[in-house]
């Protein structure tokens, strides 16, 4: 039985095609003929659903949807270009129109430019550039590059003086606008002088190992610049060279008088006065005895206070002028039959005055304090210190 394919549009290409699931014939790599495409659009205009069009024409549903979608979007039923690149749509006429639109309204979007090209019939649905193409045209051809050089014809019009002035300004702005001299408004002559001084400083202060890195004095000169006067520089040197945290073991500098005026010294003065009053007045029988007026008594310096109050450090032996009380003075506080000899035999604490060993010196010399220690044992506070 012979099959006649006279009216079949695919009759000449049956050897390269196949049959889809709906029974229709297709050709690999080739678009649908324009006759089938036109019939798909006509059925869609009649209100036939895409699924029914697919069954009637035996064309796959995906192909029908793609053809109708392109038709609704662009109004064209032509297939895409097969092989090669798309025809050039950025013609000089289109580029000039895009440039005119952009100059008239710099904030116009690419899709607005595309719609205007279609409205003014500069392009049709097949030749209108896409949104991305319009953006690329604006970026590469419409907008002028910022680094364009001035044509040499402009320089020939200006006089020699103006050309020299423009060149000097451009050189200065390009070379020193972001430098320290440019920010501070220092003229070029001063900048050159400072640069020459820095270069001389580098040559005059080499490091002994052979490298020519700048030394300490050069770094100071470089950081100072011309911002400070000589008097201000001297004050800054004194401030930064002062040792704020003195070493309590290795420092041999005498403590200045103003460094001893701490708030801790004020609180220590009251305790020393109370202790001295209790030692010098044997008639004080109770804790609330009257304290006499202020007495002259040597204060412990801030260095000694820091060395004795820091935990974990060995105690600092006070100087000769700040020695502890003598043994007769301390033994006079306790009856001789109960406690004789040196009150404390521990060498670590025997060289300190009582203000460091007794937190409340007002209790010294009180009969109530020693009422429980009549058995000949030393006071509890001293025993506690001896165990340490």
Swiss-Prot record:
<dbReference type="InterPro" id="IPR043182">
    <property type="entry name" value="PAIRED_DNA-bd_dom"/>
</dbReference>
<dbReference type="GO" id="GO:0007399">
    <property type="term" value="P:nervous system development"/>
</dbReference>
<keyword id="KW-0217">Developmental protein</keyword>
<dbReference type="GO" id="GO:0005634">
    <property type="term" value="C:nucleus"/>
</dbReference>
<feature type="region of interest" description="Disordered">
    <location>
        <begin position="143"/>
        <end position="162"/>
    </location>
</feature>
<keyword id="KW-0539">Nucleus</keyword>
<comment type="function">
    <text>Probable transcription factor.</text>
</comment>
<dbReference type="InterPro" id="IPR043565">
    <property type="entry name" value="PAX_fam"/>
</dbReference>
<dbReference type="InterPro" id="IPR009057">
    <property type="entry name" value="Homeodomain-like_sf"/>
</dbReference>
<dbReference type="InterPro" id="IPR001523">
    <property type="entry name" value="Paired_dom"/>
</dbReference>
<dbReference type="GO" id="GO:0003677">
    <property type="term" value="F:DNA binding"/>
</dbReference>
<keyword id="KW-0563">Paired box</keyword>
<dbReference type="Pfam" id="PF12403">
    <property type="entry name" value="Pax2_C"/>
</dbReference>
<feature type="DNA-binding region" description="Paired">
    <location>
        <begin position="15"/>
        <end position="141"/>
    </location>
</feature>
<dbReference type="GO" id="GO:0006355">
    <property type="term" value="P:regulation of DNA-templated transcription"/>
</dbReference>
<feature type="region of interest" description="RED subdomain">
    <location>
        <begin position="93"/>
        <end position="141"/>
    </location>
</feature>
<dbReference type="GO" id="GO:0000981">
    <property type="term" value="F:DNA-binding transcription factor activity, RNA polymerase II-specific"/>
</dbReference>
<dbReference type="GO" id="GO:0006357">
    <property type="term" value="P:regulation of transcription by RNA polymerase II"/>
</dbReference>
<protein>
    <recommendedName>
        <fullName>Paired box protein Pax-5</fullName>
    </recommendedName>
</protein>
<dbReference type="GO" id="GO:0003700">
    <property type="term" value="F:DNA-binding transcription factor activity"/>
</dbReference>
<dbReference type="GO" id="GO:0000978">
    <property type="term" value="F:RNA polymerase II cis-regulatory region sequence-specific DNA binding"/>
</dbReference>
<dbReference type="InterPro" id="IPR022130">
    <property type="entry name" value="Pax2_C"/>
</dbReference>
<dbReference type="InterPro" id="IPR036388">
    <property type="entry name" value="WH-like_DNA-bd_sf"/>
</dbReference>
<feature type="compositionally biased region" description="Polar residues">
    <location>
        <begin position="143"/>
        <end position="158"/>
    </location>
</feature>
<keyword id="KW-0804">Transcription</keyword>
<keyword id="KW-0805">Transcription regulation</keyword>
<dbReference type="GO" id="GO:0007423">
    <property type="term" value="P:sensory organ development"/>
</dbReference>
<dbReference type="Pfam" id="PF00292">
    <property type="entry name" value="PAX"/>
</dbReference>
<keyword id="KW-0238">DNA-binding</keyword>
<feature type="region of interest" description="Disordered">
    <location>
        <begin position="191"/>
        <end position="217"/>
    </location>
</feature>
<feature type="region of interest" description="PAI subdomain">
    <location>
        <begin position="18"/>
        <end position="74"/>
    </location>
</feature>
